[in-house]
C-alpha cells in the first residue's frame, strides 16, 4: 500500500506510536537522518526503546565511516548526542555499491542486535544509494533480511518511484512517500569529505597503541608468501572472538614487522581487511582492491 503524507511530524508521531521496524530511503540530503531523529524523539518520549541503525557507511552519525552503527535510545536527550555506538559492524568501504553483501549483512545483523538488546522500535537510516542496479539491489536485499513493516521514501521529485514500485511488487510493506525535509541543508562534496575525515579522526583518538599482529589473524586469510608491505596503511576492522567489531585499526609495516594501530586493542582476536588506505595526517582515504593487494591482479 502506498500512502502520501504531507507532514513529516505527523508521520513521525504515527510511526513512533505504532511501528516496530521502519526503513528510511532517500537520496543525498533528503532528510533521512532528520526524520529518524524525529521518530526517535517521539518514541522515547512515549517510553519506548529505540534501536537506531545508521547504515550510511560514508557519512555515518553513529560510529565511524566504513561501519554500520547502532545505538539504543531510551531518552529524548540521547537522540542528538554525539556518543559511541552500542554496536558496530565493519564493512570496510565508503561506497556501499562496491560491497553489497557486506552492507546488507551488516545492517541486518545490527537490526537483530537492537531487537535482542530490548528495542521495541528499530529505525533504519539507509545509504543514499537509491538508483540503478546497485541501489535497487542493495535496498531489495535489506528489505529481504530486515523485514520492516513500514518504509518511508523521501524525494525531491519522482526519483524514488522505480525503487518504490520494485519494493511493492516483491514485499508486503506499507510505503509512505514524503517530500524531502525542507530544513535540511544541502552539503557540498567538500563538506561531506570534511565530515568523513572528522569521523575517522574520532575513531583514531588517543590513547592509540601499536599491536604486533601475525599474518594468521586476518579475514580474508592472507595468501602464503604475501609481501606484508602491501598491507601498509590499510584500514581494518578490529574484532573480538564473538563476531563483534570493537572499532577501527590501521595496519603499519616496518622493518619486516606488521602492526596495527588502534585504540580498541584490548580483547582483539582478529582483523577484517578493509578496501581503503588511510592517511593519518589528513584522514583522507584511497580505495583499493583487496584482490590487487593480495594477488596483484
Protein language model features and the residues they cover:
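Preference for solvent-exposed, low-hydrophobicity sequence contexts
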Residues: 1-17, 24, 42, 149-297
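Conserved lysine of the Walker
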Residues: 32
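Hydrophobic positions on the alpha1 helix immediately C-terminal to the Walker A/P-loop
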Residues: 35, 39
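Nucleotide-state-sensitive switch-loop elements of NTP-binding domains
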Residues: 2-25, 46-47, 51-122, 130
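Phosphate/Mg2+-binding loops and adjacent switch elements
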Residues: 113-173
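A generic local secondary-structure boundary/capping motif
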Residues: 41, 57-61, 140-142
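The conserved Walker
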Residues: 28
Amino acid at each position: 500500500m502506498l500512502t502520501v503524507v504531507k507532514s513529516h511530524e505527523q508521520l513521525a508521531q504515527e510511526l513512533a506510536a505504532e511501528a516496530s521496524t521502519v526503513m528510511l530511503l532517500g537520496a543525498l540530503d533528503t532528510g533521512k537522518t532528520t526524520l529518524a531523529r524525529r521518530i526517535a524523539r517521539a518514541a522515547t518520549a512515549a517510553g519506548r526503546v529505540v534501536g537506531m541503525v545508521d547504515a550510511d557507511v560514508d557519512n555515518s552519525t553513529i560510529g565511524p565511516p566504513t561501519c554500520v552503527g547502532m545505538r539504543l535510545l531510551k531518552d529524548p536527550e540521547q537522540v542528538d548526542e554525539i556518543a559511541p555506538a552500542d554496536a558496530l559492524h565493519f564493512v570496510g568501504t565508503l561506497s556501499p555499491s562496491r560491497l553489497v553483501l557486506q552492507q546488507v549483512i551488516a545492517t541486518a545483523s545490527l537490526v537483530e542486535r537492537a531487537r535482542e538488546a530490548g528495542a521495541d522500535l528499530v529505525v533504519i537510516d539507509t545509504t543514499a544509494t537509491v538508483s540503478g542496479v546497485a541501489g535497487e539491489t542493495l535496498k531489495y536485499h535489506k528489505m529481504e533480511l530486515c523485514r520492516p513493516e513500514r518504509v518511508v521514501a523521501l524525494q525531491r521529485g519522482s526519483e524514488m518511484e522505480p525503487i518504490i514500485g520494485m519494493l511493492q511488487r516483491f514485499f508486503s510493506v506499507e510505503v509512505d512517500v514524503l517530500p524531502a525535509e525542507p530544513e535540511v541543508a544541502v552539503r557540498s562534496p567538500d563538506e561531506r569529505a570534511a565530515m568523513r575525515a572528522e569521523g575517522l579522526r574520532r575513531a583514531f583518538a588517543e590513547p592509540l597503541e601499536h599491536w604486533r599482529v601475525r599474518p594468521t589473524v586476518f579475514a580474508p586469510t592472507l595468501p602464503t608468501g604475501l609481501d606484508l608491505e602491501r598491507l601498509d596503511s590499510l584500514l581494518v576492522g578490529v574484532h573480538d572472538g564473538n563476531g563483534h567489531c570493537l572499532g577501527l585499526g590501521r595496519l603499519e609495516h616496518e622493518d619486516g614487522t606488521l602492526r596495527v594501530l588502534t585504540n580498541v586493542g584490548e580483547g582483539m582476536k582478529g582483523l577484517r581487511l578493509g578496501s581503503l588506505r588511510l592517511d593519518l595526517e589528513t584522514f583522507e582515504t584511497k580505495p583499493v582492491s583487496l584482490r590487487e593487494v593480495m594477488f596483484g591482479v
